[in-house]
């Protein structure tokens, strides 16, 4: 019995619980359906309200657009009416103009008819006058036309020649003025040292006893110094001085410096001489390179081959007519650069060509060519621009200049060399040049005496008034000047002045 209770009671409880759960679920479902139905009804009402609101807004928008369209239509109709009124006014004005043009056309037709009538009359008169002119002049119309053309042609040629001469004169004056302006501007901008160092070859001695020490026992010291440096040491009767002679300026400088140091040191023997010479040689070699680099830096020139730099540096120890060649080359480069900038040429090419124009004087070679040819070969070897090579070779007209920069280098070289005080001659050459100048003038027939004055810049010639007349003086002066140009070399120009004096003496008794 008990087991029945234990089995049936739980079963009844389970069934009762499931039934209660089912009934609760049905109740919940019914409530959810009612809530959903209520929400749906509310949504339908809201949708209807929004629909009515949208329809109302749409109607209001349509009404506004209709009013806007009507307003625009009224404005367009108003514009169209105004346009039609203006068009009507223009048509009225055009009709008036057409009437005016028609009247003018009729008037022109009348005038044209009158002109045609007058033209016929004038043509007849012209033919009659032409026949009368031909009868009076004895020339046909074609002959008269040819005569007039010839006269006009001659007059036109004369006018053309006059105009051409005027243009040539103006061009010459303009060119001279422009050249003067360029040179004046260049010289005003040029600021270089006018005084150059004198490369001396005389070594001062503390006393004449030092000469014996320099010579050494059986001349071994002087032989060692001459052998190591390649110079000639001249010891003569000149008190307290020794002369160093050599054609190579660098070797002469090495010998001079080495000799001065030996004298200062006091130890003079072959071993010491060799040591000093080697040391000075290294120092001079370094100085050569430094001088070359210095001038390149001063001029703003870059990318120069080392061989070219050394050749430039060697010019520091070389002089020409007392002018330092490196300083001269630097000055020529500055002048060439200024001229090139004034006329629009290549400044870099002009400066390089001007700086290297005398580089052949510093080249280490035994060639018998002149310095322009040697310099041109050196410029080719160091891979310079062909225009630079041409400028170097053509600066003394040994070859034909092929570019404007070569001509600029020639001009700059002439300016630097001709500048007063830039160069000087030795006394012997100076006296000889003056003597040659006077002898050349005295070789002409009728010349009594010639005097070279103002350092050879002027030649005054006294002539015999019985052999040379006033009319012949101009010819003689020109002949003397031409012979000076052909036979002598001189800087600048020489003024030839002829003096012819006639003295007539009479006595009254």
Swiss-Prot record:
It is an enzyme of class 3 (hydrolase). Pfam families: HD, KH_1, RNase_Y_N. The lineage of its organism: Bacteria, Pseudomonadati, Spirochaetota, Spirochaetia, Spirochaetales. One of its GO terms (biological process) is mRNA catabolic process. The keyword Disulfide bond does not apply. It is found in: Cell membrane. Belongs to the RNase Y family. Residues 325-418 form the HD domain. The gene is rny. This is Ribonuclease Y. Its EC number is 3.1.-.-. Residues 199-284 form the KH domain. SUPFAM superfamilies: Eukaryotic type KH-domain (KH-domain type I), HD-domain/PDEase-like. Endoribonuclease that initiates mRNA decay.
